[in-house]
Amino acid sequence: MIERIWSGRSWLYLLLLPFSALYGLISGLRWLSYKTGLRLPWKAPVPVVVVGNLTAGGNGKTPVVIWLVEQLQKKGYRVGVVSRGYGGKAESYPLLVTENVTTAQAGDEPVLIHRRTGAPVAVAPKRVAAVKALLANTSLDIIVTDDGLQHYALQRDFEIAVIDGVRRFGNGWWLPAGPMRELSGRLNRVNTIITNGGTPQPGELSMTLAGELAVNMVSGEKRAVNLIPHAVAMAGIGHPPRFFATLQQLGADLKKEYAFADHQLYTEDQLCHLADTNQNLLMTEKDAVKCFNFAQPNWWYLPVDARLPQEKGEIMLNKICSLLETNNNSK
């Protein structure tokens, strides 16, 4: 239903417009308070890159964060990551993510980023606190923040907006009548726009999410998706149909598809009922990090990687690296 409302295919969004107007007024005044100097953002001693979006729901920003961290690591930079940690609840904040920290504490995305990149990750509702915690515990050259485009309390040096190239901005309204956290004009103030799927508009970088081999969650075996028989798919991400479509493009013969809410916490009993012993359960890597402790031999996950045009991606990286060189020269 929410997809129909946000896409403009249902008139019910009209009933929510007063609340959207209030949301837009509050968010606009908040941005204006920083723009006019009534409130001052905190500036970190190292460059900060924000990877975020304008809409609620999954746009593919976490794969972009992982791609960016890995690219900067290859260039020899020490990268830290901060996140709000949606879906997690820690006893205290800021929380430094380690191998012993669970998704119930930190949220699925911070655990996934740390697992994939090995980069230090800190979680806190206030990202300034997360950045300070990282800098107090390790020497870093740059901070990447997973989400936080609207978190103006943290001064940023480079902004990347990730948008869904198929759904774009729906009906264009602020939450809750539409999907927008900020209106599309906000894109005029970011440094780079990355479009996940669909047809990119002029000035946007196209991105695809590529997955090749599924990984067994117990044995670690890697296997082509089309060679996994009697597959049942599940996804608890911002837009599950995208994952199901990816599996089908890879040749999966899906018997059933189960869509869960983003940041869904799972139990062993809940997932064991999705696929019997003669079937195989296929899930996203974001879901898998929440299920390793009770994974079954017939459970698999599909890692995906962000792929950007090499030349344009390198241009963006060079701009970020120039910030690092400028910061190093000023010390």
Swiss-Prot record:
Keyword Lipid metabolism: yes
Enzyme class: transferase
Identification of the protein by name: Tetraacyldisaccharide 4'-kinase
Pathway the protein acts in: Glycolipid biosynthesis; lipid IV(A) biosynthesis; lipid IV(A) from (3R)-3-hydroxytetradecanoyl-[acyl-carrier-protein] and UDP-N-acetyl-alpha-D-glucosamine: step 6/6
Biological process, per Gene Ontology: lipid A biosynthetic process; lipopolysaccharide core region biosynthetic process
Source organism per UniProt: Photorhabdus laumondii subsp. laumondii (strain DSM 15139 / CIP 105565 / TT01) (Photorhabdus luminescens subsp. laumondii)
GO cellular component: plasma membrane
Top-level taxon: Bacteria
Enzyme Commission designation: 2.7.1.130
Function summary: Transfers the gamma-phosphate of ATP to the 4'-position of a tetraacyldisaccharide 1-phosphate intermediate (termed DS-1-P) to form tetraacyldisaccharide 1,4'-bis-phosphate (lipid IVA).
Assigned protein family: Belongs to the LpxK family.
Transmembrane regions: none
